[in-house]
């Protein structure tokens, strides 16, 4: 989303060392820099909590100022951080990812890291594209139709960049709440997405590091 297109402007950026836990000086300077109605904190864990507390100490809080985050916020339990209530952050669709997470936990007995689902989608995408002629590969990969994977809708742009539909989550006392659902398809090409979540057995990609029986159970609940 372009801040220019949305008639927004960036008024201040703060930098700090990853080892730093004292944000008093930086936050004080930022708080007095200019009028603003939103603050983005691209961090997580104790640094996020400490920084939010320092903003509140300087009277920077909701409803006058909205806190914005990144997907890194999802790695921190913020249900007790009242200062961050109503704050929002983007995340890949949990409704799509639930299937992958449940199957992974059932098979391997542990919670998958977020990057695992992206790797899974990448392998499935490679499997789908392997049926294409070499001369048509680029067009198939960067086509406007896009794909639907275990993380929801995505497409690869001709520039080499990628677009991924995201949902917006709001911090509440009961945990993250979905306030804006992720698009499940490309609105410009509503009938053209290739769903790569469900591929016939004979077209499955090869898996390494896990036995075939584990993979089959994971995918097909055998």
Annotated model-derived regions:
Residues 1-222:
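Extracytosolic ligand-binding ectodomains
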């Amino acid at each position: 989303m372009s801040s220019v297109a949305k008639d927004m402007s960036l008024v201040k950026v703060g930098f700090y060392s990853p080892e730093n836990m004292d944000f008093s000086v930086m936050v004080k300077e930022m708080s007095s820099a200019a009028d603003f109605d939103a603050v983005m904190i691209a961090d997580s864990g104790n640094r996020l909590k400490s920084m939010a507390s320092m903003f509140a100490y300087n009277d920077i809080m909701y409803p006058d100022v909205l806190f914005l985050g990144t997907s890194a916020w999802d790695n921190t339990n913020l249900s007790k951080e009242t200062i961050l209530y109503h704050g929002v952050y983007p995340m890949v669709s949990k409704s799509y990812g639930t299937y992958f997470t449940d199957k992974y936990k059932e098979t391997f007995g542990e919670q998958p890291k977020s990057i695992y689902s992206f790797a899974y989608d990448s392998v499935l995408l490679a499997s789908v594209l392997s049926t294409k002629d070499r001369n048509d590969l680029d067009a198939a990969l960067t086509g406007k139709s896009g794909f639907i994977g275990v993380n929801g809708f995505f497409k690869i742009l001709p520039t080499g960049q990628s677009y991924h539909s995201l949902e917006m989550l709001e911090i509440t006392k009961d945990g993250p709440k979905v306030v804006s659902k992720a698009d499940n398809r490309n609105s410009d090409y509503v009938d053209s997405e290739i769903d790569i979540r469900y591929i016939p057995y004979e077209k499955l990609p090869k898996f390494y590091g896990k036995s075939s029986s584990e993979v089959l159970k994971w995918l097909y609940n055998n």
